[in-house]
């Protein structure tokens, strides 16, 4: 029983393989027929002078042919005597088995038979290629008739498509020849590549009609004709420029209420502009500022330019502050000239003359006490007067200021607050310092006249050494305050240490640390009632 079943199974398997081989043969016939039709169409197109590109599926068809041959070769390699595995019933695999020549012969025979049928014009098997890939059932007579009918319909449709394509290719070739030769066709609408909008020169009636019947909507930006967009934009710009100068044109598109509001706003702006221009002029009609003299009245007839408003916006705020603009403008120009002259004088003046005003009152105090004090040793005074002029210039002037100068500074600040409208914080500080220095110069002259009397008394009390030291001592008194005070303190009868660390006496040796030396000697020193030691802030002990 087992052997009979095996034999039946082998016979059934052989029958299935035969069916598959037949289906593959039919598929190959259809592919060969299709390939031959494509070649015929290509030859025909070449004869007509139209270049046709190669079909894209040629490579895929070759792959299909190779796959068909492999499938046809695979199942036929086994011999009738060898058993077939159950999983290989689909027939898509190739097994390395014996006897491959018979299968090759059958496949080649099928290919040749298909080619022979095609050359003889046999029935088309194009509809069977979908079922030929491993279909297990047999193809009946009904299937053959339906497939033949479908293939004929497909052939008819394909022939019509080829004819249409040939006509279009002929039209394209003729159009290209005419374009090269410069000949216009009588009916350019038929050419699907023709676009009269891209052409230049005079337009014919047909092209003009076509352009008028454009696909663009009339409300689109630029209208139906896109070439008029650039010229339309230029005309619009010119009209806008012309409308800027005249205000009546702007009101044409306004309603009554908008027009009245616009006219009221326009009058207010013109009034403000005129007031601003009047603030910039003197009562005589001249410009207050020199750089405005270049302006002409014609610049403001249509209204001032926006750049003019921007350049004077900050000035308008500054001019509105003072109560009397005309007098302030005149004073401001004079004040600026004075400030520049003061700066020149300050730069040319020596730096040492700025400080002496701070200690002028204290010098009077020390000079009045000098009259009751006897003279000190001449050698110590001469040493101190020779060494101090160079050292006193190095000492910085303290930041203290007498109450009189504070009052003067306040007065100067009030004047500057009225004078400076734009740059109050910057120029006030510089101008106050310059005013104070000028007033200090005047007060210095007064104090020099007042100090001439005490100086004469000094010369009378100390006739021995004062004439020698006066040429050096007098300028130091005008320049630096601590120097004459220190020199006068040396005139006390009680021997005291030098008031300034840099002017030692005869018997004193210089030391490295003067602070320590002063602390050691301060308890044993004797001072007059009202005098101060050198370590204290003696210039401010006037209270």
From Swiss-Prot:
Q: Where in this protein does the record put region Disordered?
A: 38-543
Residues recorded as bearing Phosphothreonine in the entry: 94
Residues forming coiled coils: 147-183, 422-452
The record's listing under InterPro entries reads:
DUF4594
User: Compositionally biased, Acidic residues: which spans?
Assistant: 405-453
Bias class Polar residues marks the residues at: 376-394
Which GO cellular component terms are attached? exon-exon junction complex
The molecular function GO annotations come to: RNA binding
Q: Which residues carry this modification: Omega-N-methylarginine?
A: 106, 120, 126, 128
**What the protein does?**
Probable component of the exon junction complex (EJC), a multiprotein complex that associates immediately upstream of the exon-exon junction on mRNAs and serves as a positional landmark for the intron exon structure of genes and directs post-transcriptional processes in the cytoplasm such as mRNA export, nonsense-mediated mRNA decay (NMD) or translation.
**UniProt-recorded name of the protein:** Coiled-coil domain-containing protein 9
Instruction: Say which species the protein is native to.
Output: Mus musculus (Mouse)
